[in-house]
A protein has these predicted regions:
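Structural signature of Gram-negative outer-membrane beta-barrels, strongest in the C-terminal barrel
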Residues: 219-368, 372-377
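Face-selective signature of the C-terminal outer-membrane beta-barrel domain
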Residues: 32-55, 71-260
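Membrane-embedded beta-barrel scaffold of Gram-negative outer-membrane proteins
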Residues: 99-101, 294, 319, 326-447
Length: 715
């Protein structure tokens, strides 16, 4: 049995300890081997572990923030695990393994904020569809729409997050020889569950709480994941070397009660081959002490996330009425609340990642070298797309208040929850109630659904690791590792977009056009990047004082990126313009070959009343030629114009560096203490961007300086 205790403290601001992370952890482990009695011929190894920690992040001592504000987040957890390994040594099974684990966390966070408003502030909490007018909070049930009186106030918001994860796995191994070849077969299954016992966002001060909707994590269903796999591992002698072949197949299944997708399932195959040309045995004095080559291919299927399978509800809040302000400086807003959620897509395909890799591993005079080239292609990558539903709602303007006989201070406003009609009554009862005139507005309402990107995403690169032979006189090891990486992504889906927050030109009516864009409503629909990074790690052991000192230098030698705007054939989607004030002053210049202002048009558009797609550019030119200013301005809102000349310029960022440092000291056999500091030299150097032709701080590319101390006690 072993016991250990650990204390960790990490501070992110060296000038003031106002933001710090602290954690106390204790662990207990038990291991036993049963090899007598009924287990004499088939020994059973049993292990049990229990770990718990208390701690979290706190900003309670910040002297520079607004007085009285603070935030803190708990990091409390308890984890348990067990393992049974039964060596059966039967002709049909070699050993059987059973593993299980449980992890429960308390990650509740709290934040106290300062707020102020010159007039009353409208707050929304409603989750049911309908029309609601703001009322003051008077305790008890929270109104769908309420207001906080003008002034200043503090509020504490909390998020109760208590996830529980359980896992159980069973694996059987069978090892046997086929001639001189060693064949190992592995069959296994695993099951895991995820659920949450927290209540989500809440406030004990609802009279001053900001806009939020109750979403109780504890009411969500449990996510069950079950998997099964089989793997065959064959080791075949080949001359002085050997060939290792591994083939495997895995099935994953996810089930969430109440999900429209029901049971989701997938199959993921893989194959590895390794040829050890020169094995390590007997070559300790040779120049090349080991040499092997390897290759692998596999396909990993990613099932949809919980958020896709059981989406969180969202809400669209439309202000449909604003009253006059009375002598107490209070006005009343009415809102139309539309609950929305990510919709079910019966045509959704599972995302697949196809991986290919070749590598070489060698040992030359004690220097271990590994070189790997890889290519990954992601198919059917997940994305959230949108389409627009045609909706109507009742809107009441403030024009109807001008001729109202009821004095402003005596007006009591009410709205019908289903029709949206606003009625004004007299608080004193002297004057009759009046119904305000209203209009029916037509508007597009966005709906979101999980979708697949039709164009694959390609990643490829080279990785290397060199572990130099140990410098015995200094007890020092040096490692150099790095990578060259290339990435290209191009969105080719035809997507809808409408600026629903805007108004139609020349009116106060909702905007009523939809644009259709290849890859989305932006200048670009993709990007490409190339990076070259390398790291040097030096680790020195000082046995006499039982100390380990480690320093790591991280370097970015190449960082290239470029924004893309093109279709599947390579034709450019964005257009260069000669005059930034005229989006129709099109030129024939390439967006990549010159520095110019650019504009992106939708391919087609449609209206609320007519869903037939129409050519956008032709309609824009016709509206300008005919002098239809309102239509021109409406169409203009669907175009995206750059305000800089370098939108599609190549961006090379100059090299930058960061250093990390750590020291670990053993104190007897009972304790160890570690100090670490990331970005140890607090690199604030300026780096150059060829795209913007400006210098910028390296702080946006490397981690902030932070340091910490860890104390471990072992029993």
């Amino acid at each position: 049995m072993n016991t250990s205790a650990e204390y960790t403290e990490s501070i992110s601001q060296q000038m003031s300890p106002y933001s710090a992370y602290r954690r106390e952890q204790m662990s207990l482990s038990y291991l036993n081997l049963f090899n007598s009695g009924i287990f004499a011929a088939t020994p059973l190894r049993f292990s049990l572990g229990l770990t718990g920690n208390l701690g979290g992040m706190s900003t309670t001592a910040d002297p520079d923030a607004v007085q009285g504000t603070w935030s803190k987040a708990a990091d409390n957890a308890i984890r348990a695990n067990f393992s049974l390994n039964w060596l059966l040594s039967k002709p049909w099974i070699t050993n059987l393994e059973l593993n299980g684990s449980l992890s429960y966390s308390d990650k509740e966070s709290e934040e106290r904020t300062f707020n102020s408003s010159a007039i009353n502030k409208t707050i929304l909490h409603g989750r049911e569809a309908g029309y609601y007018i703001a009322v003051p909070y008077s305790g008890g049930d929270v109104p769908p729409v309420m207001y906080i009186p003008g002034g200043y106030w503090y509020n504490i918001m909390s998020d109760d997050d208590r996830p529980l994860t359980t896992k159980l796995s069973l694996k059987a191994n069978h090892s046997h020889f086929i001639g001189k070849a060693n064949n190992k077969i592995k069959i296994g299954a695993d099951w895991s569950t995820d659920r949450n016992f927290g209540i989500g966002a809440y406030s004990t001060e609802m009279e001053t709480a900001p806009t939020f909707r109750e979403y109780r994590y504890c009411d969500l269903p449990t996510m069950h994941n079950a998997g099964a796999y089989i793997e065959d591992n064959v080791m075949i002698p080949a001359g002085k070397g050997r060939i290792n072949l591994i083939a495997g197949l895995r099935s994953d299944n996810t089930l969430i009660k109440g999900s429209d997708y029901g049971l989701t399932s997938s199959l993921s195959p893989r194959f590895n081959a390794k040829y050890t040309i020169l094995p390590r045995q007997g070559r300790e004095r040779k120049t090349v002490r080991e040499l092997s080559v390897r290759a692998s291919w596999g396909e990993a299927v990613k099932l949809p996330s919980f958020a896709m399978l059981f989406p969180m509800p969202t809400y669209r809040d439309i202000r449909v009425f604003t009253s006059t302000t009375n002598s107490s400086n209070i006005s009343y807003d009415a809102y139309y609340i539309q609950p929305r959620s990510v919709q079910y897509n019966p045509d959704l395909k599972w995302q697949r990642n196809r991986m290919m890799e070749i590598g070489l591993e060698t040992n030359i005079l004690g220097n271990k070298i590994s070189l790997t080239a890889f290519r990954n292609r992601t198919l059917n990558s997940y994305r959230i797309s949108s389409h627009y539903d045609r909706t109507t709602y009742s809107y009441t303007s403030d024009a109807g208040l001008a001729n109202l006989a009821i004095p402003a201070d005596d007006r009591v406003f009410a709205v019908d929850a289903s029709s949206g009609i606003v009625t004004v009554s007299d608080r004193t009862g002297k004057l009759p109630s009046e119904v305000l005139p209203h209009e029916t507005y037509k508007e597009f309402a966005p709906s979101y659904y999980p979708d697949n990107e039709i164009n694959p995403i390609d990643r490829y690169g080279i990785e290397w690791v060199v572990d130099f032979a140990k410098i015995k006189a200094l007890q020092t090891e040096v490692r150099v590792d790095g990578s060259w990486y290339s990435y290209k992504s191009l969105g080719l889906n035809l997507l809808e977009y409408s600026p629903v927050a805007s108004h139609a030109a020349g009116t106060n009516l909702p905007y009523n056009l939809i644009g259709h864009y290849i890859g989305g409503n932006a200048y670009s629909n993709g990007s490409e990047t190339k990076t070259l990074r390398t790291n040097i790690t030096i680790t020195t052991h000082i046995p006499k004082v039982r100390m380990i000192v480690s320093a790591k230098l991280e370097a970015s030698l190449l960082k290239y990126s470029r924004t893309l705007s093109e279709d599947a054939s390579g034709a450019e989607l964005a257009r260069t313009i000669n005059d930034i004030s005229d989006i129709l002053s099109l030129s024939n210049k390439s967006i990549y070959a010159t520095d110019s202002y650019v504009v992106r048009f939708p391919e087609t558009y449609c209206t609320y009343d007519d869903p037939t797609p129409r050519n956008y550019l032709s309609a824009l030119e016709a509206a300008k030629a005919s002098g239809d200013i309102n239509l021109y301005n409406d169409l203009w809102q669907l175009a995206y114009k750059s305000n800089v000349l370098y939108t599609f310029r190549k961006d090379y960022v100059s090299p930058y560096f960061s250093a990390n440092f750590s020291v670990t000291k053993e104190i007897g056999d009972l304790a160890s203490i570690s100090f670490y500091a990331n970005n140890f030299f607090v690199n604030r150097a300026q780096i150059w961007s060829s795209k913007t032709e400006t210098y910028m701080t390296a702080a946006s590319y490397i981690p902030r300086f932070y340091y910490g101390l860890t104390l471990r006690l072992k029993f």
